[in-house]
């Protein structure tokens, strides 16, 4: 005769942090482990979701993600170089798409076909047509698609001390009058775009040995 005791009886989780059994957790895989993808590596505040795999066509990015995974979770993540392998991994419930935008539509549709829910970085797709295909796939396969417009759900929308919902209601109420003047400035922390775009006569460079350029390019013409 034996007795099964709950894990919390042994004080496995301290304080008020609630323990969630692995069988009750959703699992997540990240495609693209560059800057944005690596930020997704730190989504560990909710015990109901667990990162299990990462994918990248850049060996340096992938190795860094695996290293950070061990540091963060104390376990080795499953590594992929082909996104299709991650999408069809039966151990993955949610696919986090953090690749260049020319891949978003194709990956999202295939993830739906594979029975996965999707968390996709901005922009959703490059074109309206691609976006419509994603919507069709989500509806056809009954999946959940979430676009990462996360500032709309922050407690302080761009430092205004509130979420975007009451601001939207305020504008729609007409209390501020019409028309409104909207002033836009460069986003802090993304100034590299100002120096990278619009350059001419760039010197061709060889493809880095650690990068699978054909897979990175995918459906893009160049």
Predicted regions and their residues:
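A contiguous active-site-proximal alpha/beta segment in oxidoreductase catalytic domains
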Residues: 125-210
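Short, flexible loop/turn elements at secondary-structure junctions
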Residues: 35, 92, 101, 124, ...
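Flexible, glycine-rich phosphate/dinucleotide-binding loops
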Residues: 37, 60-61, 154, 188-191, ...
